[in-house]
Design a protein with these regions (language model features):
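Positively charged, low-complexity terminal tracts
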Residues: 1-197
Length: 197
């Protein structure tokens, strides 16, 4: 079977989004151009890394090339949900990020998880030997929007415990900082024994 490389040179949207309740969410990246939609599945940490690195790349591009980039506190333009139905093309394994100076674009490449070992030379390579890929070219504004939206999507999950910073679950939380006990409970005593003393 031949390799599929989905290229979006001028996407209408490139966004991160989720499906599911906090604590049980699936994370997706979606590239859209007119009626063409490609969705890929990935881990929350991958979204976080991509958003962080994209922000750092924009700062480096501005520093080295003088290219105008939107400020970090820019307002988010695209708050619409993912396009549905979500048909997953593949699960993301390797990710690549770069700057195309000629096009003044951030280049994002997402490679499918593969049973075959590949080195980083397959990133941005069009040869038939490699995993399926999605390659997206983003303007600095689109890249900043992606980064900002991704941060908001990640932050919309479960709130962190104020003591141990682990995510709080709706059914409760056993905090390692309190050795598994809840405040107000006496250790090793039933409520009746505690009231008698």
């Amino acid at each position: 079977m031949s390799r599929a490389i989905h290229v979006f040179r001028t996407p209408d949207r490139f966004i991160a989004g989720t499906v599911g309740e906090p604590g049980d969410r699936s994370f997706y990246l979606q590239a859209v151009h007119e009626t063409r939609v490609i969705s890929v599945l990935l881990e929350k940490q991958q979204v976080q890394v991509l958003a962080d690195r994209m922000g750092l790349l924009l700062e480096e591009v501005h520093r080295r090339f003088g290219t105008e980039v939107p400020p970090q506190g820019a307002q988010l333009d695209d708050v619409s949900p993912l396009v549905t139905p979500i048909d997953v093309e593949f699960r993301v394994g390797t990710m690549g990020l770069g700057w195309d100076a000629d096009a003044e674009s951030v280049v994002v490449e997402l490679l499918a998880v593969s049973e075959t070992e590949f080195d980083e030379s397959v990133v941005l390579d069009d040869s038939e030997d490699g995993p399926d890929a999605v390659r997206v070219f983003l303007s600095p504004l689109q890249a900043r929007d992606f980064s900002l939206r991704s941060e908001r999507v990640i932050a919309a999950g479960r709130a962190p415990c104020p003591l141990c910073t682990e995510p709080l679950a709706p059914e409760g939380h056993i905090c390692i900082r309190t050795n598994g006990y809840r405040r107000g409970q006496s250790f090793g005593l039933t409520q009746e024994q505690d009231e008698e003393e």
